[in-house]
């Protein structure tokens, strides 16, 4: 019986694993020879994007704990200021635009505290799971892996795949794609 996961990042990872197979389940095959390379670039870019809102989520909650009596207006100002700081540090060098507030668009950070980083970690976990699942019996492995229950994240992924939880496989795959 499937029995819990270490945290919501692992739930997101499993959702990503199944989403990857949605067209396949409908009998639609993508024969594009560049598909694997494009998938890797897409995963890296998606993680880069969600990391920004994840950092903002964490920063906003740190700010709220430091300012427990803040008004809604002060929170709004802080969210906008923090989003600009994160944008300017991590995104402006890539996009060439400063003081963008697009990272502040996610209302999740208030309604579902500290959830957004689960997406970024979920993508790292998914990448490791996909590498492991490649060429194996999907149903049996998913059943085996997700029966482990609520272990610490690194113990869980190590028992699932034999490797520590790390972004290294993603970076290695990206380097390979960029070389080609």
Give residue spans per PLM region:
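C-terminal, non-catalytic "cap/extension" segments appended to globular domains
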Residues: 9, 17-20, 24, 50, ...
């Amino acid at each position: 019986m499937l029995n819990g996961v270490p945290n919501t990042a692992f739930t997101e990872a499993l959702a990503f694993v199944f989403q990857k197979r949605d067209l396949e389940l409908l009998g639609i095959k993508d024969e594009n020879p560049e598909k694997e390379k494009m998938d890797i670039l897409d995963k890296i870019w998606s993680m880069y994007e969600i990391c920004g809102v994840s950092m903002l989520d964490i920063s906003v909650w740190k700010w709220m704990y430091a300012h427990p009596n803040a008004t809604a207006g002060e929170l709004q100002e802080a969210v906008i200021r923090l989003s600009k700081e994160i944008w300017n540090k991590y995104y402006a060098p890539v996009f060439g635009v400063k003081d963008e507030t697009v990272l502040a668009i996610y209302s999740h950070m208030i309604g579902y505290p500290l959830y957004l980083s689960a997406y970024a970690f979920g993508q790292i976990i998914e990448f490791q799971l996909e590498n492991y699942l490649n060429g194996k019996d999907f149903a049996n492995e998913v059943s085996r892996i997700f029966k482990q229950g609520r272990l610490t994240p690194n113990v869980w992924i190590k028992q699932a795949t034999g490797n520590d939880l790390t972004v290294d496989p993603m970076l290695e795959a990206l380097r390979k794609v960029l070389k080609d």
